[in-house]
Amino acid sequence: MPLTAYFQPARAAARGTVVWLHGFLGDHREWQTVAAACVEHNHLFIDLPGHGGSAHLCAVDFAHVNEQLIATLNSYNILEYWLVGYSLGGRIAMFHATQGNTPGLRGLVVEGGHPGLLNADERDARFVADKQWAQRFHDEPIETVLDAWYRQPVFATLTDAQRQELITLRACNAPTALATMLEATSPGRQPPLYEPLARLSVPFHYLCGERDAKFRALAATLNVPLHLITGAGHNAHRENPAAVACCLNAILRP
């Protein structure tokens, strides 16, 4: 079944379509500030399962999400596209790009997305941790869980005001739907993608906030063009949208 999505035509002669995938807790609006500065492309903003207009849809694993993504592209007759994804959306984008059934894919841009844990014990431990987070979404007020979520080390660069803004923004999500998606797409259930990513025949660019030490280190292991976003942490497109838009325009123009 297709996911809920929102199509926006280019404001100039279209060079193609960009498909935007948000992170966990986000929705189709997450990329719109950046996309507004990319005037030469059509845009398709997707709500992933358990989020936004797709909150009523669930997924069981990465392959299922990929099927839903392909169905969405087909429903909008998207024949050629660049795929841009942040965090969870980046992991889904990388999975999609490496499955072989992507004749229309013209390029891949990932911001702060993990290519996959190589060690089985690490994957098992991460899945256990994500199941615990999922249970918290079931059991506790969503504001309490979000406050704890945004205090994880990867979000250490957030100020108190930025953290509270995100909590307020994300509190409208459906906790049960989030819990289901969190378990289905945990890095603990994600296959390592390093080898298939290295064999991609389309351009692959990685964006990362310069203050995001963890994902800067991960990006260095991919051997792909790395674009550091000034003054930003893990959520670079939110913290410095102008720089991300400038970077994307340079990548997307042939």
From Swiss-Prot:
UniProt cross-references to Pfam families, sorted A to Z: Abhydrolase_6
Pathways involved: Quinol/quinone metabolism; 1,4-dihydroxy-2-naphthoate biosynthesis; 1,4-dihydroxy-2-naphthoate from chorismate: step 3/7; Quinol/quinone metabolism; menaquinone biosynthesis
Catalytic activity: 5-enolpyruvoyl-6-hydroxy-2-succinyl-cyclohex-3-ene-1-carboxylate = (1R,6R)-6-hydroxy-2-succinyl-cyclohexa-2,4-diene-1-carboxylate + pyruvate
GO biological process, one term: menaquinone biosynthetic process
Keywords attached to this entry: Lyase, Menaquinone biosynthesis
Enzyme Commission number(s) of this protein: 4.2.99.20
GO molecular function terms attached to this record: 2-succinyl-6-hydroxy-2,4-cyclohexadiene-1-carboxylate synthase activity
Listed InterPro entries: AB_hydrolase_1, AB_hydrolase_fold, SHCHC_synthase_MenH
Superkingdom of the source species: Bacteria
NCBIfam families (alphabetical): menH_SHCHC, PRK11126.1
General function of this protein: Catalyzes a proton abstraction reaction that results in 2,5-elimination of pyruvate from 2-succinyl-5-enolpyruvyl-6-hydroxy-3-cyclohexene-1-carboxylate (SEPHCHC) and the formation of 2-succinyl-6-hydroxy-2,4-cyclohexadiene-1-carboxylate (SHCHC).
Complex and partners: Monomer.
Protein name per its UniProtKB record: 2-succinyl-6-hydroxy-2,4-cyclohexadiene-1-carboxylate synthase
Organism: Cronobacter sakazakii (strain ATCC BAA-894) (Enterobacter sakazakii)
The gene coding this protein: menH
